[in-house]
Amino acid sequence: MARIGGVNVPVNKRVVVALTYIYGIGPSLASKICEGCGIGEDVLVSSLSDEDVVKIRNFIRSGCVVEADLRKEVAMNIKFLMDIGCYRGLRHRKKLPVRGQRTHTNARTRKGGTRLAVAVKKG
C-alpha cells in the first residue's frame, strides 16, 4: 500500500481510483491531480515511481484540503450555522433534514428509529 495524504491507497488499482480513497478527493479532482503531476490516469499505483508518489503528495499538500483538515472545516461550518441561529443551524441542532426534504413520512435516518411503546401489565 502506498501512503498518500495520510491514507493507505490500494496498490492494485489505477491512480485515479486510488486517489478517491482519500476523503475530499473525488473522481474529477483525482484526474486533475494526475494531469497536474504528468501521470496517466490508467497507470496502476504499483507501477508509480517514488518520485511520482512525492509529486502527488506535494500537489495534494499544496492545493487541496483533505482528510482531518476538511472534516474539521465542515464541522466548524456546521457549528457556525448553529451558533448564529439561522434556519439551517436550527435544523442541524434538532437533527432534522436541512435541505427542505419532507419529514412527515420520511427522514427516518436523520430523525432516528421509531420508538415503540412497551405495554406494562397491571397487576
Curated annotation (Swiss-Prot):
GO terms for cellular component: cytosol; small ribosomal subunit. It holds the Pfam family Ribosomal_S13. GO terms for biological process: translation. SUPFAM superfamilies: S13-like H2TH domain (SSF46946). Keywords: Ribonucleoprotein, Ribosomal protein, RNA-binding, rRNA-binding, tRNA-binding. PROSITE patterns: RIBOSOMAL_S13_1, RIBOSOMAL_S13_2. One of its GO terms (molecular function) is tRNA binding. It comes from the Bacteria. Part of the 30S ribosomal subunit. Forms a loose heterodimer with protein S19. Forms two bridges to the 50S subunit in the 70S ribosome. Located at the top of the head of the 30S subunit, it contacts several helices of the 16S rRNA. In the 70S ribosome it contacts the 23S rRNA (bridge B1a) and protein L5 of the 50S subunit (bridge B1b), connecting the 2 subunits; these bridges are implicated in subunit movement. Contacts the tRNAs in the A and P-sites. PANTHER family: 30S RIBOSOMAL PROTEIN S13/40S RIBOSOMAL PROTEIN S18 (PTHR10871), SMALL RIBOSOMAL SUBUNIT PROTEIN US13M (PTHR10871:SF1). Belongs to the universal ribosomal protein uS13 family. This is Small ribosomal subunit protein uS13. It comes from Anaplasma marginale (strain Florida). The gene is rpsM.
